[in-house]
């Protein structure tokens, strides 16, 4: 259905242009986009907690736009810029980005108190939380968001 959503979440290792599985397996972002673009829903959201995850846009060069590459239906929220690490915390049991996404979806990102979390609200919360927690490190982390503006007001969760 048109209102359905696909949510893809990856937390693990990353390198420029790809997420990294176990062993020598690489899954390039362009392959993720290619597979997800075939879905009928126009609402696809990918969360990537991996080093260099901001490199998802590296293939979107001057010859085409991100919207053309994704059919204007995929939004990526990435843990870091293309040249940054994505930090983990052993006491949290996951990365700062994953932790912020979870806290945000559980209500912390509800900026206007309407008991709904939109993509824009979640990103604003995640960005503030992660940059604050990593600002004193040698390599601060800056989450990234790219996708069609029509996705920014899509409600990801409500209660």
Task: Outline where the language-model segments fall.
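Cysteine endopeptidase catalytic domains of the caspase/legumain-like
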Residues: 1-159
């Amino acid at each position: 259905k048109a209102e359905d959503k696909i949510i893809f979440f990856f937390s693990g290792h990353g390198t420029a242009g790809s997420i990294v599985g176990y062993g020598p397996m690489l899954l390039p972002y362009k392959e993720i986009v290619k597979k997800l673009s075939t879905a009928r829903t126009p609402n696809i959201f990918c969360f990537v907690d991996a080093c260099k995850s901001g490199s998802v846009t590296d293939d979107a060069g001057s010859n085409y736009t991100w919207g053309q590459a994704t059919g204007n239906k995929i939004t990526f929220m990435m843990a870091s810029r293309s040249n940054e690490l994505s930090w983990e915390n052993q006491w949290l049991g996951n990365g700062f980005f994953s932790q912020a996404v979870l806290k945000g979806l559980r209500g912390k990102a509800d900026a206007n108190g309407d008991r709904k979390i939109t993509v824009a609200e979640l990103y604003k919360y995640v960005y503030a939380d992660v940059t604050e927690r990593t600002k004193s490190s040698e390599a601060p982390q800056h989450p990234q968001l790219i996708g069609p503006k029509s996705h920014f007001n899509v409600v990801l969760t409500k209660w």
